[in-house]
């Protein structure tokens, strides 16, 4: 699961850099991907804790 949170952080950083450089479409897409990866990570972490 560490890889999943790592990917989310990478996409978050990519989105912030793209936003600063003015590529708003790329930034929005990267933020969406990062958001879903964080949600998946949290769900999997909760399932792991419960099992």
From Swiss-Prot:
Keywords: Cell membrane, Membrane, Transmembrane, Transmembrane helix. The keyword Cell membrane applies. The keyword Membrane applies. The chain crosses the membrane at residues 1-21, 31-51. GO terms for cellular component: plasma membrane. Signal peptide: none annotated. It is a multi-pass membrane protein. It is found in: Cell membrane. Its main location: membrane. Belongs to the UPF0391 family. This is UPF0391 membrane protein Mbur_2216. It comes from Methanococcoides burtonii (strain DSM 6242 / NBRC 107633 / OCM 468 / ACE-M).
């Amino acid at each position: 699961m560490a890889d999943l949170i790592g990917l989310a952080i990478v996409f978050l950083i990519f989105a912030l850099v793209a936003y600063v450089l003015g590529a708003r479409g790329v930034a929005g897409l990267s933020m969406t991907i990062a958001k879903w990866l964080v949600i998946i990570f949290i769900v999997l972490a909760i399932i792991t804790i419960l099992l």
